[in-house]
C-alpha cells in the first residue's frame, strides 16, 4: 500500500514539475539533451524520493538537473554551446520593438561567465525567487543576491560597451 501511495505522490510531483524542469534543461543543455536531463533528474528524484524535500521540490529538482547537466558537459564545451545558441537567437529576424536592445543584451549575456549567465537566467527566464535560485546553485540567499547584483552590473557594463561600439561604427552624416 505504501508503494502505491509513493507512486501516486511521485506521479503528482512529476506532473507538477516536469514542464519547469524541461524548460530549465532546454535553456541550459539545449533540446537534444533536455529529454535525457529530465529523465535522469526524475530518476534521481525517484531514487531519493523518501529524502526529498516536498516543500521545496522544484528548487531541489532544478538543483539535480543542474548537477546532471554539469556531469554531462565540461564548462568549456557548455559555454561554446550556450554562446552559439544565444548568437543564433540574437541573429533571428524579429520585427518587434527593441530588436537592437534584445540583440545587444543576448550578445552581452553570451559574453558573461557561465555562473553570471546562470544567476541572471534563473531569475529572468526561469522566474525563480532569489531564495529558490539560491537553492538551485547551492548557496545562501544573501550570497546569491550578491552574485545577482554583480552579474547584473557586469551585464549592464557589457551592454553599455556594445552600445558604445555600435555608435562608434555608425557612419557620420
Feature map (PLM): residue ranges:
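Short amphipathic alpha-helical boundary/capping segments
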Residues: 104-113
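Arg/Lys-rich amphipathic alpha helix in sigma70-family domain 2
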Residues: 62-84, 97-98, 157, 161-163
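Σ70-family region 2.3-2.4 aromatic/basic alpha-helix that recognizes the −10 promoter
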Residues: 18, 39-48, 55-78, 148-152
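DNA-recognition helix of helix-turn-helix
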Residues: 66, 131, 137-161
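Short, charged helix-capping/linker segments at alpha-helix termini
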Residues: 1-12, 22-40, 49-56
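C-terminal edge and immediately downstream basic/flexible tail or linker adjoining helix-turn-helix-like DNA-binding
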Residues: 1-5, 9, 136, 152-173
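Internal acidic/polar
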Residues: 71, 79-102, 129, 168-172
Amino acid at each position: 500500500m505504501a508503494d502505491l501511495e509513493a507512486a501516486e505522490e511521485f506521479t503528482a510531483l512529476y506532473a507538477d514539475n516536469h514542464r519547469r524542469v524541461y524548460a530549465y534543461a532546454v535553456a541550459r543543455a539545449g533540446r537534444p539533451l533536455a529529454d535525457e536531463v529530465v529523465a535522469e533528474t526524475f530518476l534521481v528524484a525517484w531514487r531519493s524520493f523518501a529524502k526529498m524535500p516536498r516543500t521545496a521540490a522544484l528548487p531541489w529538482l532544478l538543483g539535480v538537473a543542474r548537477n546532471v547537466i554539469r556531469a554531462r558537459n565540461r564548462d568549456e564545451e557548455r559555454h561554446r554551446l550556450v554562446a552559439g545558441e544565444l548568437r543564433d537567437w540574437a541573429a533571428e529576424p524579429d520585427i518587434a520593438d527593441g530588436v537592437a536592445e534584445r540583440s545587444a543584451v543576448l550578445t552581452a549575456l553570451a559574453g558573461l561567465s557561465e555562473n553570471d549567465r546562470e544567476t541572471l537566467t534563473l531569475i529572468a527566464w526561469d522566474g525563480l525567487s532569489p531564495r529558490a535560485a539560491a537553492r538551485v546553485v547551492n548557496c545562501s540567499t544573501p550570497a546569491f543576491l550578491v552574485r545577482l547584483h554583480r552579474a547584473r552590473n557586469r551585464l549592464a557594463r557589457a551592454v553599455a560597451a556594445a552600445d558604445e561600439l555600435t555608435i562608434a561604427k555608425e557612419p557620420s552624416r
